[in-house]
């Protein structure tokens, strides 16, 4: 019973992220208000079930969406950054490069080459 509740909460959290990843202010606190849980408990549970932190998951979702936009649009990097929830293009580029080992601009070049 408790297992099902936990899985349901994680599912809801993931769905919430999918629907709100564009919001730069999306935080653990925001999602916990939605789920009526304490941030500490939610964070522990999320990591236990998914094997990653909530922030790592949110970052992954945002970067996957960015990759889709880089592949499917001609939007400038700063536009894509904003569309996936990053207010600062430089920070977006930093996070992207840390994850993929290449800048968003170079990534696009390798895909369209």
Cite the ranges covered by each PLM segment.
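Basic, amphipathic alpha-helical hairpins
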Residues: 1-2, 14-26, 46-50, 67-76, ...
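N-terminal positioning helix adjacent to the helix-turn-helix/winged-helix DNA-binding module
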Residues: 5-13, 59-62
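The cytosolic transmitter module of two-component sensor histidine kinases
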Residues: 6-10, 28, 77
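Short Gly/charged-rich anion-binding patches and loops
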Residues: 12, 41, 65
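Short, hydrophobic secondary-structure boundary micro-motifs
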Residues: 26-27, 108-109
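Basic/polar phosphate-binding segments, predominantly the helix-turn-helix DNA-binding elements
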Residues: 29-58, 83-103
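Terminal helix-turn-helix DNA-binding modules in bacterial transcription factors
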Residues: 48-87, 109-113
